[in-house]
């Protein structure tokens, strides 16, 4: 039943875009960000050469320069608010996100977000005067957001893509929280969020190298689900099929290939131990979100005062960044974002019939009235498999019965466009 799932070969359009990503541009952006001395959220904001204010203004100017090639499709705003005294915020401070929006040409109401944070820190999270280059954490992610903005400014995505450099991450995810809250309060349909944080090095603290892998951290059962829904998810074995994990599977399917030169290693966790990231506020807001992070971290080069002790160099210095690796991570992000944007939206109200004891699987969903949707595809895998292994195109219908036991498989349904692009799968709940 069905056929083996085959990862789609990247089309010429995606190949052309990812080839535009320049390691030299990545290096130039990171070098400039490091030159501001510190980008600590609490650092000064009235200088043109030093502190987070200088970094903010330079990022915004560059983004606006890119927008000049967009024929009006890209807009750039500096989204700011004053954060009152709070955890890691000893005095009121203005937190600013630089947000570039490439408006979709056909479905502008469907939105995808990619972020990197441009603030930095040293050992003491409250030290806002010492130099904090933050070359890897997270000038690397910011550089990817900016490089993608440069490239996408010249394209016409079907859906809207937001590329943001956010602040306040090191103090408590404040900038990303404000961005996610703003989108949520305006009822924006964000169908996917990618967070790039610490994506600049291919070498770990023991010298281990893996220059062709990026980790994708994906949360299990969503924290926003009610107790009733969470209990039902566990009852039916859906703990590994959260929207975040479907997004991670999608990224692995479309962006782990010879064009990007990368493997996407899905990690079934919200984040690393003792760490957090800007995807979390988006998850809390109910949006599918994942975090990309390099495979082997060197903690001597994160959150450290600049110093040398016993021959060991500490600090997040630019000399430890692998620009070619960072560019490849950018290719993964671009391939994922573009594939999401060009595919139809995810199917709605996907359910599985569990009212009778039998060995069939009956699935239902709402048929989209969009002419961009050509059909729907059912995908499935064994309960112990990480990725989808089988697929069956069932046409543009709203239900299907398969002679496969729902007890033995995990099922999903995804939309297929007239352009053959496929959405992330949606896991069915009983209904």
UniProtKB/Swiss-Prot annotation:
Main location (coarse class): secreted
A single GO BP: proteolysis
The EC number(s) this enzyme carries: 3.4.-.-
Glycan-linked positions: 46, 185, 258, 310, 349, 359, 369
Residue sites binding Zn(2+) 2 per the record: 137, 170
Residues annotated to bind Zn(2+) 1: 117, 137, 197
CC annotations in GO: extracellular region
Required cofactor(s): Zn(2+)
Localization per record: Secreted
Keywords attached to this entry: Glycoprotein, Hydrolase, Metal-binding, Metalloprotease, Protease, Secreted, Signal, Zinc
Cofactor note: Binds 2 Zn(2+) ions per subunit.
Domain Fibronectin type-III stretches: 344-431
InterPro entries: M28_fam, Peptidase_M28
Highest rank taxon of the organism: Eukaryota
Name of one Pfam family that matches: Peptidase_M28
GO molecular-function term, one example from the UniProt record: metalloexopeptidase activity
Family: Belongs to the peptidase M28 family. M28B subfamily.
Protein name per Swiss-Prot or TrEMBL: Probable zinc metalloprotease Lema_P086240
């Amino acid at each position: 039943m069905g056929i083996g799932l085959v990862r789609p070969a990247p089309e010429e359009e995606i190949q052309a875009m990812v080839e535009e990503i320049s390691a030299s541009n990545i290096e130039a952006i990171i070098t400039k960000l490091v030159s501001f001395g510190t980008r600590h959220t609490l650092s000064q904001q009235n200088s043109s050469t030093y502190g987070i204010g200088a970094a903010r203004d330079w990022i915004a100017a560059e983004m606006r320069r890119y927008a000049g090639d967009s024929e009006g499709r890209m807009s750039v705003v500096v989204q700011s608010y004053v954060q009152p005294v709070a955890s890691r915020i000893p005095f009121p401070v203005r937190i600013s996100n630089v947000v570039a929006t490439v408006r979709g040409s056909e479905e502008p109401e469907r939105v995808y977000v990619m972020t990197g944070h441009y603030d930095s820190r040293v050992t003491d999270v409250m030290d806002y005067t010492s130099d904090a280059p933050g070359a890897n954490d997270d000038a690397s992610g910011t550089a990817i957001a900016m490089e993608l903005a440069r490239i996408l400014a010249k394209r016409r995505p079907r859906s809207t893509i937001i590329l943001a450099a956010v602040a306040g991450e090191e103090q408590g995810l404040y900038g990303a929280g404000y961005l996610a809250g703003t989108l949520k309060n305006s009822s924006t349909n964000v169908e996917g969020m990618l967070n790039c944080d610490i994506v600049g090095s291919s070498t770990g603290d023991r010298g281990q190298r893996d220059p062709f892998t990026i980790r994708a951290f994906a949360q299990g059962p969503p924290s926003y689900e009610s107790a009733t829904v969470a209990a039902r998810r566990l009852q039916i074995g859906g703990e590994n099929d959260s929207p975040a994990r479907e997004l991670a599977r999608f990224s692995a399917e479309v962006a782990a290939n010879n064009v990007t030169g990368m493997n996407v290693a899905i990690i079934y966790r919200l984040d690393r131990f003792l760490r957090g990231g800007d995807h979390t506020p988006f998850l809390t807001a109910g949006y599918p979100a994942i975090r990309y992070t390099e495979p082997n971290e060197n903690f001597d080069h994160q959150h450290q005062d600049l110093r040398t002790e016993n021959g060991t160099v500490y600090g997040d210095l630019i000399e430890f960044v692998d620009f070619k690796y960072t560019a490849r991570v950018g290719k993964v992000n671009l391939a994922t974002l573009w594939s999401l944007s060009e595919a139809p939206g995810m199917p709605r109200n996907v359910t599985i019939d569990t009212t009778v004891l039998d060995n069939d699987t009956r699935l239902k969903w709402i048929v989209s009235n969009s002419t961009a949707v050509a059909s729907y595809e059912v995908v499935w895998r064994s309960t112990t498999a990480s990725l989808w292994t089988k697929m069956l195109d069932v046409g543009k219908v709203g239900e299907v019965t398969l002679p496969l036991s729902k007890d033995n498989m995990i099922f999903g349904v995804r939309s297929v466009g007239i352009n053959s692009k496929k959405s992330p799968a949606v896991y069915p709940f009983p209904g």
